[in-house]
């Protein structure tokens, strides 16, 4: 029961009629003068104390249902500070009425001391259960939507584990039974399958990401997957735009000298984009790096340049400018077919343009033309940019050098724009080869030849054995080991799977091809021991026993010889050695050999350095017909089946 106490003390004359004192009996109220005098003195003292202290109004809550019982430990004795404040009948009745109303609104007993007005405000502001529920839901939603910082978990390295084990063992020296011996658990490799592709090892890296070898588990076809992360694409200027442009261009191209785009898919939960291409074993740059002389033979360079021009002719017919032709972007398929790749900076020329005018400069500095790096033109021809890059690529393949080389980038640009082209001195180049290089490296793009002019050049139309897939190219195809990184994944899928069901990352069961064929193939290759240590890309170990172009002291232009034999003094023994090459030894355009050429070769060459050919006696007749294709007779069925890649007849 709640109610405000009186703020002022009544007079002595009103006290007998309005107040009930605890000492009053039920029969009546004492009216003696002594009592009145005592009450009057008490009231006077109380008024003085209240005037001095001036306390705030007090609220005395009294419960009418409370049954006082002295046995419970209660006491009604007067307070030590003075008699209790008197209570009137009106105050008690009002408190009882308010208590009844409070019970109807909110049942329960509540006792408090404070201002009555404040209590009413608290009752008015009290939240209903529905409001409390809404406030709780709002707070939970705010906590759930609060951004949280992502911290990378600490790397559990071998050194960290050893340190922890050492500390634990030192702390438990008193009990040898608790000693911990750490031995790493060799978990079996699990087959990684994403979007129907079994993933192998890395076969290449680049500025946009890395390339891995994969196998289509439904067709057992080797593919190459280019993996690009969202974060790296955002950091590269125009990274996303270049990727979208590459996808749109490759989807419209279909040529044997252009790498084929198989599929593109995106995994937002991993933050990666995947581009699936046809598989290639390496690049022209790998072939150059494998040679100790860092160059290729003239015949190999001609065969590669031949297919490069066919690919550029197709691109330019589709109004596409690659703008980044270089040996690293010329891939080699398993049959040594050249395929142009990396269309990240390629540009689609507008259909309504009469020329290949471009304004956006991209590419590798050493392969860029003067109009792009020297800054003396407002625009440039995208088709002529590809021809300049093709000329630098040809120069690099035949000599192992670049036409313009400087250590500082600005000096390189200045050299490209001002210095004349100098022919390499470490190799002997024919006049036709020098002429086509000079024309391709013409600093004026208006007079620089286009792809049609290059394909009509005499050196381009010259025949080489390498053009027919012979020579060193055929030797690589016949004796080389193909890069293969899928053996651990295949072994984990078929040999380690057992009777368990293989699931992809989404938990779906994979329908695999019959494993018996794959198991027999794996068993065969495992017995031969040729799949375990193969690298991901072409290297010197890919072609065991292959004779490369060795770099000699003072590697200068070799003397010409009708038989194709290069006699060079050896640094150790001084004996003449035949230039290392293939069985047919194509080092230049094969001239018409005179009679008795074979006997001269056998007499001059050292027996231990010569690669014997069992059919060398038939070589003059074959070489005699090789340069002139128009004199061939009617071809048989087998000739049509095994015809060369460059022969369209």
Curated annotation (Swiss-Prot):
The keyword Kinase applies. Residues 597-609 have a biased composition (Low complexity). Residues 1-11 have a biased composition (Polar residues). Residues 64-77, 117-129 have a biased composition (Acidic residues). GO terms for biological process: establishment of cell polarity; glucose homeostasis; mitotic spindle organization; regulation of cell growth. Its EC number is 2.7.11.1. It catalyses: L-seryl-[protein] + ATP = O-phospho-L-seryl-[protein] + ADP + H(+); L-threonyl-[protein] + ATP = O-phospho-L-threonyl-[protein] + ADP + H(+). Its cofactor is Mg(2+); Mn(2+). Residues 1-132, 548-649 are annotated as: Disordered. ATP binds at residues 203-211, 226. The keyword Transmembrane does not apply. The active site is at residue 324. SUPFAM superfamilies: Protein kinase-like (PK-like) (SSF56112). Pfam families: Pkinase. One of its GO terms (molecular function) is protein kinase activator activity. Residues 197-460 form the Protein kinase domain. Belongs to the protein kinase superfamily. CAMK Ser/Thr protein kinase family. LKB1 subfamily. This is Serine/threonine-protein kinase par-4. The lineage of its organism: Eukaryota, Metazoa, Ecdysozoa, Nematoda, Chromadorea.
